[in-house]
């Protein structure tokens, strides 16, 4: 068995894996234990009461977090004409059609999000084997295939997170940085949970949000007592 580092021993001593923590206590604990030499992200894992084997119970979507994610997002937009000008005005770093596709084919992908207008999907469709495995393929379900590309760019820049359950029915995403104020992390988490509950499949029965855990990039998961979150969640 691998020897635990001093840091991991400290984390194990501080975090009670059998306990659900008050949200404020959970955030304070994450901040205390975030001792990496870089600014760690705060991630969340939400266990959903779904059967991920059934396509009609899978959960996928996007929501804008009120305080963003703390990341500078570079956006590429496939579109043309007036939409191209609107995308540039909204802050997109790369805008084009075949010329942008050529960059992608060359491996020049200096962007984090790809957005496309419906008329551009004939070009984007050729890039599925490149963009798909990287999680960059535009999709109408998460608002990245849209006639209103300017709004989509603004949402991406404002801290929109995309979510999709894995094969175990768990949503993994980021809700900010460890340098955020505690209230900012709490409000971002609450906004995500509100969005998830709105996306609950009609065929999912019983408790929908079964467990919520938050962690930092290099830290352990801390389970959150959902009763300590806002009443709107």
From Swiss-Prot:
One of its GO terms (molecular function) is rRNA binding. GO terms for biological process: regulation of translation; translation. One of its GO terms (cellular component) is cytosolic large ribosomal subunit. InterPro entries: Ribosom_uL1_bac-type, Ribosomal_uL1, Ribosomal_uL1-like, Ribosomal_uL1/biogenesis, Ribosomal_uL1_3-a/b-sand, Ribosomal_uL1_CS. Keywords: Repressor, Ribonucleoprotein, Ribosomal protein, RNA-binding, rRNA-binding, Translation regulation, tRNA-binding. Part of the 50S ribosomal subunit. Belongs to the universal ribosomal protein uL1 family. Binds directly to 23S rRNA. The L1 stalk is quite mobile in the ribosome, and is involved in E site tRNA release. Protein L1 is also a translational repressor protein, it controls the translation of the L11 operon by binding to its mRNA. This is Large ribosomal subunit protein uL1. It comes from Vibrio cholerae serotype O1 (strain ATCC 39315 / El Tor Inaba N16961).
């Amino acid at each position: 068995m691998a020897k635990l580092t001093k840091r991991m021993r400290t984390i194990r001593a501080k975090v009670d894996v059998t306990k659900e923590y008050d949200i404020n206590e959970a955030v304070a604990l994450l901040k205390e234990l975030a001792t990496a030499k870089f600014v760690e992200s705060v991630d969340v894992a939400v266990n959903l009461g779904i059967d991920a084997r059934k396509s009609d119970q899978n959960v996928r979507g996007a929501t804008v977090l009120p305080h963003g994610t703390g990341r500078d997002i570079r956006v590429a937009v496939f579109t043309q004409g007036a939409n191209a000008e609107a995308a540039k005005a909204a802050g997109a770093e790369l805008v084009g059609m075949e010329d942008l596709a050529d960059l992608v084919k060359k491996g020049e992908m200096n962007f984090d999000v790809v957005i496309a207008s419906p008329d551009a999907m004939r070009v984007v469709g050729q890039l599925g084997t490149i963009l798909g495995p990287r999680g960059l393929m535009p999709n109408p379900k998460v608002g990245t295939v849209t006639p209103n590309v300017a709004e989509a760019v603004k949402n991406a820049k404002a801290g929109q997170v995309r979510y999709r359950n894995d094969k175990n029915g768990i949503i993994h995403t980021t809700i900010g940085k460890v340098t955020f104020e505690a209230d900012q992390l709490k409000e971002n988490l609450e906004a995500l949970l509100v969005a998830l509950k709105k996306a609950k499949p009609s065929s999912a029965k019983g408790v929908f949000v079964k467990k919520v855990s938050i962690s930092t990039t290099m830290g352990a998961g801390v389970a959150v007592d959902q009763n300590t979150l806002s009443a709107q969640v």
